[in-house]
Amino acid sequence: MRDAANKQIEIPYLLKIGNGKTERVGKYLFDKRFLRIALYMGDGIVELIGGTLKAGLAECGIETVREHIAASVEIDEITHSAFSLPAVDAIVGVGGGKALDFAKYTAHLLRIPFISIPTAISNDGFGSSSASLTILGKRKSVKAASPFGIVIDLDVIKNSPDIFMYSGIGDMLSKITALDDWQAARDRGFERYVDFSAMMAYNSLDILFLKHSYNIRSESFQRSLASSLTVSGLAMEIAGSSRPASGSEHLISHALDEICEKPKMHGIQVGVATYTEINF
């Protein structure tokens, strides 16, 4: 990593959180002169919002050079797909973890802008510069593209199951122990600590938890959850690592992934691990 004084920080130039955003994706891309794109979507996304999304793209004259359903995150498949892709201005990922990881790693390989359009807010991965890929049969976290743009349509988010909301809350809770672990590592001289990044991570907690209402079905809460997860992703980009958002609670979750026949959602596991650590 370069010296902190010379570190280049990539932040989203395009950030839209609100209602009716899917139909405006075409306009957002046109405004940035991203006229040729590759579109990577998760299973079921075409049926969920595909019609609205494609209509908006066509209306603005955006050409979709490739449309791909990302059913896996095998690194060999992504690499082959990336280097067989005709020239495009941007990579657009729509859906959950697999689609976004497929898209952001493709953008990383080709060094072109990545637009992240999550259809659920179950963790902060949609705003981070890391991807969870399958390498030699095992899931590993690798460096990927930081989002040039993030578009979150609350009209889509509100239709996701409750478990996705709880997972997002759990992922946010994990910042509590992650930040404590980071400070402990700093105090023992093991790791570099970035004050501004830590402040951003603490602020991401404040956005969500300093609220008067915790009704997960309210638009206000969902907007706050989306915003806090976005800020958490930015905190990681500033730090140059996942330390502001990932600590020992994530190691517990990774262990559960290995030993459980049917692991739960990532945010659920890290949330439970955080609660256990706090009360240990």
Task: List each model region and its residues.
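ATP/NTP phosphate-donor binding region
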Residues: 1-90
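Solvent-exposed alpha-helices and their adjacent loops that cap or buttress functional pockets
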Residues: 7-8, 32, 83-86, 107, ...
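Structural motif
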Residues: 38, 89-92, 113-115, 148-150, ...
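Gly/Ser/Thr-rich loops at beta-strand to alpha-helix junctions
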Residues: 43-48, 95-100, 122, 242
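A short, small-residue-rich loop immediately preceding and capping a beta-strand
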Residues: 85-106, 110-121
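Active-site segments that bind and position negatively charged phosphate/pyrophosphate groups
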Residues: 198-280
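A glycine/threonine-rich phosphate-anchoring loop and its flanking beta-alpha core
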Residues: 109-205
